[in-house]
Amino acid sequence: MKKILLLATGGTIASRPTAAGGLAPAITSEELLACVPELADLCAIDAVQLFNLDSTNVGPAQWQEIVRSIRENYAAYDGFVIAHGTDTMAYTAAALSYMIQNSAKPVVLTGSQKSIYNRDTDARNNLYRAFVYAVSEGAWGVQLVFDNKVILGTRARKTRTRSFDAFSSIDYPETAVFRDTRLIPFLRRPADLPPVQFYEQLDPAVFVLRLVPGMRADIIPLLAPHYRALVLESFGVGGLPGGEQGEMFAELRRWCDSGRLAVFTTQVPHEGCDLAVYEVGRAVGELPGVLEAHDMTPEAVAVKLMWALGQTQNRAEVMRLFETPVEVDII
């Protein structure tokens, strides 16, 4: 029988109503397991309550805590299941994909849209299936299990705020799906995985700027004292209003000339960006320090930058790390 470690972090799955009328995490890891007694027939389980937070409050410090716990327990367990809130689960899944690379053991995130104590909750289904995937043959790496889907950590996005079908795999096949109680794998553990690598250093000095028509360019210098990298969510396949002659281009050139980075992505959910297509993007793509996110998810773009910036102060090396595919984040 395989041995799995449950890491409980809070979220809706672990929430109870408060006196003020809202929901807040309060249910423990032991209580979660008690709600799914059939897990005892599936595998041996230990549980750790890392923290109990609404996932809106989960960020780099909590990602580091999760990684430390997995690294310290990696040799003792066959896999890991993380109970997590849904709102930032895709960020955590992407972050763990960069901070725990080449893992032959599964690191599975799951949660729910309703508390595990809610009568019509999706929590028990999701938690049980997360463990089913974790003990399955061929399971590996950072995955997100939700509503009968298994999604690679770098490809997961929350696409619905209320429905049980809350997460989608963006521009990449699902790792596996469940049909009733049967797990149907589409992707299996690569045969030539290098040894697992753990990283803990992150630099969160990344700002994401969503362009809107009419936006003033003077916002960019206001960010310079506080951030090393700027992610620009641009229109379509990418570009700047006014192109090479615009005020935004001039400010971005000053940003890059100061040694900072800028990464272009798109506001469109699918198919990525390509600055070479239109004149409003071609000159931008030639600026030193400008990168393209290609088909990466917005969550992966932001946290990969945090990870790369945490490894080095050298801009060229940060650019190399960002452009190197990790866990199929770039196709």
Which stretches of residues belong to each language-model region?
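Short, acidic/small-residue loops that bind anionic groups at enzyme active sites
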Residues: 95-122, 131-137, 255-266
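C-terminal non-catalytic interaction/assembly regions of soluble proteins
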Residues: 237-331
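Short acidic, glycine-rich surface-loop motifs adjacent to enzyme active sites
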Residues: 77-89, 226-239
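Short acidic, glycine/serine/threonine-rich loops at helix termini
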Residues: 16-20, 93-94, 119-122, 152-158, ...
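Internal gly/pro-rich beta-alpha loop/helix module
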Residues: 109-179
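ATP/NTP phosphate-donor binding region
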Residues: 1-72, 254, 270
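Short Gly/Thr/Asp-enriched flexible loops that form oxyanion-binding sites at enzyme active sites
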Residues: 83-105, 242-251, 280
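Accessory alpha-helical/coil subdomains and C-terminal extensions
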Residues: 2, 7-11, 28-29, 34-39, ...
